Amino acid sequence: MTEEVFIMSQERVKRPGHTRWYISSLLSGIIILNYFDRVAISVAAPAIQDSFHLTATELGIVFSIYTYSYTLMQLPVGSLLDRFGVAWVTRVGMTIWSFLTILLAFLQGKLLLYLFRFLIGLTSASAFPAASKATALWFPPSERGLANSLFDSAAKFSNVIGAPLVAFLVTTFDWRVAFLTIGCINVLFTIFFWQYYEQPERHKRISKSELNYIQKHNAITTEQIPYKTGPLLKKLFTNRKVWGLMIGFTGYGYTFNLLLTWLPTFFKHTYGMDLMSSGLFTAVPWLISTISGIAVGGWLVDYFIKKGYPNTKVYRTVIIVGMSFGFFFLGSILTNNITVAIICISIGLAGISATAPVGWSISAELAPIGSVSMLSSMVNLANNLFGGIIAASLTGYLFDVTGSFTLSFLVAGFVLLLGLVFYVFVLGDVKRIKL
């Protein structure tokens, strides 16, 4: 166990103030809205497919082209966040993607649909690296598991509230009203974020005692990157632990993104559900995964670390158990019973969701001082390159070829196994990389 964790587990430290938890709620709000767009395109997919006369392969392009641009921006946005800070990079990105979402509601023609999805991906790319960076700045390691789980689980919770909401708006009005509504909500939240977020030492509402508490126990106290981007990337890309983390996280991300984009369509085609029913059934596994991410990947991880257990042992145990449960989602392709299918998907999604906050915690602990956003962006790059782009587009192609989701789910199972192998055998002990 590290000296810092030992001290924090032995001392009865008073934790003054709650501003950092308000910040955590703010970060969760960003992720919910960031994923509302993805949930909307997923739930409204059948209506959009009819409106633009898209094949399943073309619909896969609509899903994946967002991820192409989102992925392309990961390394640039990581550098921008480390150099200019979370506040301004996120403010600018949120403002642009909010108005693009509103304009999306008025589009005509599939080429414009592709273009706007590409642009929204570019401007929303900062969300997860920014949340990871802000959490590392605002929270000491003993609280970081829960803080990471809150913003990570927000991505799942967006499906719980977003899927029924979008399904209602699409069935009551149309898909354009759904995107117009989401865009307006984004604008309002952007104004709130603009006013409230700042890093700890600049925040107007933080008490001196809470600031001292954060700075005393936190190894990450600056947003400024002390290294040139080129040498830093070379060092990180040639580090074995970084590859263990990137591919390990991708094992989670492939199944997550497949279910995020295709689950409503899976229910519709496999069980003949209407849009409203598929939206409601989609919310069930995501609600369970939200609870799992916070309870296991957050609270339970922090509990054992505060008890003095080594970070690496705690992280590895959660990853092995969580990913093992993740394979349960494959049971959904072996049954014709919708209840059994939802149970299998719920268990599998809950399992992998418990591992996601652990991945973000590992990223913060591995990254050289001042470069948390860069490493987080690299993890998100790998996750979205393989888990996002390939999962979304390959699933559409395989469905066109085979007429079912069976092969797509089997591919996801293989990637999940590969991720588990990299986490366990390539990542090794979680220790900060020194340059």
From Swiss-Prot:
Domain of life: Bacteria
Keywords: Cell membrane, Membrane, Transmembrane, Transmembrane helix, Transport
GO molecular function list: transmembrane transporter activity
Database matches in SUPFAM superfamilies: MFS general substrate transporter
Subcellular location: Cell membrane
Protein topology in the membrane: Multi-pass membrane protein
Coiled-coil segments: none
GO cellular component: plasma membrane
Transmembrane regions listed in the UniProt entry: 26-46, 61-81, 96-116, 119-139, 150-170, 177-197, 242-262, 281-301, 325-345, 347-367, 385-405, 407-427
Protein family per UniProt: Belongs to the major facilitator superfamily. Phthalate permease family.
Name under which the protein is recorded: Uncharacterized transporter YybO
Source organism of this protein record: Bacillus subtilis (strain 168)
